[in-house]
């Protein structure tokens, strides 16, 4: 199957799935309401129901057109959470348009039907889009070969990022050498390093291959050379991943100055805005209260079971909060009463345990943990009392990993980012492997979170946390 054929089928199937899931929602809503409310069919005149269905179909066509022409969802590859944000934002706008049209037309419509219809739309469309891409991937239609220009640190990071984002559908088949230390036969994660010049592009390489230029900051000559070659030979699918390590990327605005090769990036520190902090705090209060209310029977049951092992059910361990202020981080007790003595004896007699503790402040096979403590830690239920830390304003639902005072030094320059935000019950570290992640990566993830905070990122992390907890990834 040619590239153009695969592209056509991908775009067609994605558009059909969006349209079908969009229109299907109103029929499902009508069936559910007819089943739940016996007099529903008599409440709205038949002609108004028909008009509403026609309006919904019209908006479905418009929505698919918007996804295609304005957002280019059927042609450009975008990351999952970025694409999902654009989908939900678009659907909310179309929901407002629909109710506005019905209000101005003075139709006799059911608010229940409108609410249920659009709740289903917000669920059906993203789910159908995701399922369609999975089917296209299984059929071998969604994938696109990609070649990375560069073999330095930036190219390695680009490769890891692409591998972690399956929604892009990119299959990296090679790296084009950019380093003097590269030798024939070298590879990166089993992918060969290619030594070539622009003549190589004239024969064996498909013009539809995705090229990603990811050279180092000091290799601008190499970058410009390849961009010129791609333009001359008519290669359209070319992306550049510049070296932006350490920069805040979320909500960054880009502009350029006419007739100059100067790009201006306006960076934002979202957590510095009072409106962002107010939104985050309001979300923390509402969500934590709701979770406590729902889980209160479970909290009481766990407290009872922990007390049966002797000692208090909840303990507070000192952690460093926003601005360097210490606070008692609450947890269900998962260790024996004399845990301090047990740890000291273990570290004194076991060099391997000492090395592991000095590296991560954790032990994979910790003898201090009680029988029920193993279950609580595996399921992360030992951290549920931190909901009360969130209510008190000492923590947030999402944030950097709470650390002890001794760890501040290990954060080095990144400690300033840690101190800008409240520690979180969950965060990037928790959804990126937790205890299986090395300490340097933990620090990087905490700093990345603070620099790139947004409410949408918090919501994404919360959804990913549910998946991680259910799979028990990196928990011990």
Language model feature labels by segment:
Residues 86-87, 91, 142-159, 312-335:
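Membrane-cytosol interface motif
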Residues 245-247, 251-255, 314-367, 426-444:
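Short, glycine-rich, amphipathic interfacial segments at transmembrane boundaries or analogous
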Residues 1-21, 25, 77-79, 127-293:
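N-terminal hydrophobic signal-anchor/signal peptide
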Residues 150, 211, 238, 297, ...:
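Residue-level signature of catalytic and energy-coupling elements of molecular machines
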Residues 356-422, 461-469:
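A short, structured surface patch at a secondary-structure boundary
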Residues 273, 447-450:
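Acyl-group handling in specialized metabolite and lipid biosynthesis
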Residues 275-342, 461-476:
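A hydrophobic, helix-centered structural microdomain
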Residues 1-141, 170, 280, 476:
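Signature of alpha-helical transmembrane segments in polytopic membrane proteins
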């Amino acid at each position: 199957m040619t590239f153009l054929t695969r592209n056509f089928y991908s775009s067609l199937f994605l558009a059909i799935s969006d349209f079908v899931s969009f229109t299907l929602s109103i029929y499902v809503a009508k069936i559910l309401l007819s089943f739940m409310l016996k007099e529903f069919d008599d409440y709205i005149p038949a002609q108004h129901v028909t008009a509403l269905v026609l309006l919904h179909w019209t908006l479905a066509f418009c929505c698919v057109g918007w996804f295609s022409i304005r957002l280019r969802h059927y042609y450009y590859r975008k990351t999952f959470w970025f694409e999902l944000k654009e989908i939900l934002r678009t659907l909310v706008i179309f929901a407002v348009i629909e109710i506005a049209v019905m209000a101005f037309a003075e139709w006799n419509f059911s608010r229940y039907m409108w609410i249920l219809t659009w709740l289903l739309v917000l669920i059906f469309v993203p789910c159908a889009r995701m399922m369609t891409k999975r089917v296209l991937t299984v059929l071998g239609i969604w994938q696109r070969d990609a070649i990375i220009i560069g073999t330095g640190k930036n190219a390695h990071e680009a490769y890891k990022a692409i591998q972690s984002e399956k929604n892009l559908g990119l299959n990296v088949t090679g790296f084009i050498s950019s380093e003097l230390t590269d030798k024939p036969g070298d590879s990166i994660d089993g992918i060969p390093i290619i030594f070539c010049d622009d003549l190589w592009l004239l024969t064996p390489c498909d013009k539809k291959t995705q090229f990603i230029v990811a050279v180092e900051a000091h290799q601008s000559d190499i970058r410009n050379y390849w961009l010129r070659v791609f333009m001359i030979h008519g290669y359209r699918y070319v992306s550049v991943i510049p070296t932006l390590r350490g920069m805040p990327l979320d909500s960054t605005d880009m502009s350029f100055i006419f007739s100059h090769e100067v790009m201006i990036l306006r960076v934002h520190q979202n957590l510095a805005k009072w409106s962002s902090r107010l939104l985050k705090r309001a979300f923390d209060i509402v969500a934590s209260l709701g979770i406590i209310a729902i889980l209160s029977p479970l909290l009481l049951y766990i407290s009872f079971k922990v007390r049966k092992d002797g000692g208090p059910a909840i303990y507070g361990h000192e952690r460093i909060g926003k601005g360097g202020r210490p606070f008692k981080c609450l947890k269900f007790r998962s260790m024996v009463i004399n845990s301090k003595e047990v740890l000291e004896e273990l570290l004194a007699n076991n060099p391997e345990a000492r090395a592991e503790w000095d590296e991560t402040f954790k032990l994979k096979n910790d003898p201090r943990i009680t029988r029920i403590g193993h279950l609580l830690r595996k399921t992360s239920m030992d951290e549920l009392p931190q909901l009360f830390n969130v209510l008190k304003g000492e923590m947030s639902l999402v944030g950097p990993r709470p650390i002890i005072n001794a760890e501040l030094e290990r954060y080095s320059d990144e400690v300033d980012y840690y101190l800008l935000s409240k520690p979180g019950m969950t965060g990037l570290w928790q959804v990126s492997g937790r205890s299986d992640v090395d300490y340097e990566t933990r620090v990087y993830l905490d700093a990345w979170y603070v620099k790139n905070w947004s409410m949408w990122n918090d919501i994404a992390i919360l959804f990913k946390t549910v998946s991680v907890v259910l799979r028990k990834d990196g928990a011990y």
